[in-house]
Amino acid sequence: MEADGLSTTMEEGFKGLLRLMGSVKNYDWGRSAKESCVGRLYRLNSGRKIDEKQQYAEFWMGTHDSGPSYIVEEGGRIQNGYANGGGVRNKSTLKDWIEKNPSVLGETVLSKWGTQLPFLFKVLSIEKALSIQAHPDKDLAILLHKEQPLVYKDDNHKPEMALALTEFEALCGFISLEELKVIVQTVPEIVEVVGNALAELVLDLNEDDEEEKGKLVLRKLFTEIMSASKDVITEVLAKLISRLNIKNKVRELTDKEQLVLGLEKQYPADVGVLAAFLFNYVKLNPGEALYLGANEPHAYVYGECIECMATSDNVVRAGLTPKHRDVRTLCSMLTYRQGNPEILHGTAINPYTMRYLPPFDEFEVDRCILPPYSTVAFPSAPGPSMFVVMGGEGTMTTSAEVIVAEGDVLFAPANTNITIATSSGLHLYRAGVNSRFFEE
């Protein structure tokens, strides 16, 4: 049975809620089972025991083949509504189900993206920094997938947004020209790698120069660092760490310097440790978000977050990772824009819900925190929605009432009115197609 008591082959006009089982990723940078929000969510969502020896990094909700969501039927939460982990996974994926029931996406979404769910929804638990990476634009994604399908597994672009659940740290985009000059003047190890001539080019730049000139110099600088030999990087990092440890005895290190020391412990002799000086070091409080367009460098450093993106798993990596590195592609694809990223604080759409709208058609995210004995309405949207319950319990009502609790994941078709209520408090997130897309 489905969440509303219907079979997995739905009639046209289905307006219920479809309960899902997500996929988990056990990457090295994730948090231990006991400390990981992802591990807890996966245990509650799937009813499976978690491996205490594993790191739990990502919980995926969507249709991507690398981590599909499955329809849940019979038993457990489906029959009695409670979080006892007894749900049975159907053989049908959400992707299969949508292809059989395309009307659930809504006419506007179907005409733009076909039967593909436009967004991929995730929860991340980060203990150790992720790789310095960027996601290709649509044209580059098509090319990379064609040339290296085992590495780049689809042909879609991957703009994304991270919404902090806890205090959250990230490297995001290149620092301003003014900050870059300070780095060149105060981090001699960078000059040792790139040479005095290139360092002088940076210092000679000014705000009146054409933007493309600045981008060209920054590209040369970044490429020289990322392309340096392992021996050179090992040598200069040893000098850097020694210098910072000595400085730490006479003055308090800057946040960036402390970050670099921490990264070196996680990734000894890795070029990404030195490259970190070139990026904005961003700290988010819970409820704050940052977004990343195609071809923008970034590395999540620490914390837990909700993440939403276009449906893709394409990542070009070049530092802070044991995985495949593609330095040439990364250095050639970046925009080399400089300056601080925009931090989103959300816009209130009702007393309990904040909406985060990045400049991408594929997705938006709502953060809903209901106090005890409260009710909120999610009016029908022209596109589909995905909900994940992060805490508490309550009910979600469409054509029928469904009891929900922490770990539940539900898919709502387009044009579905939903009322959410709780007597004890409820914390959930919704992903949907960007509402601005429907206003165009």
PLM ranges: what are they?
Residues 1-249, 322-340, 365-367:
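Transition-metal
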Residues 116, 124-129, 136-139, 154-160, ...:
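Ligand-binding loop in jelly-roll beta-barrel domains
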Residues 122-123, 130-131, 160, 281-282, ...:
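His/acidic/aromatic-lined binding-pocket segments of jelly-roll/cupin-type domains
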Residues 203-324:
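Contiguous mid-protein beta-loop-alpha structural module that forms a pocket-lining wall or clamp
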Residues 286-287, 293-295, 371-373, 392, ...:
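Tight coil/turn sites that cap or link beta-strands
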Residues 349-352, 364-381:
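Conserved short histidine dyad/triad with adjacent acidic residue
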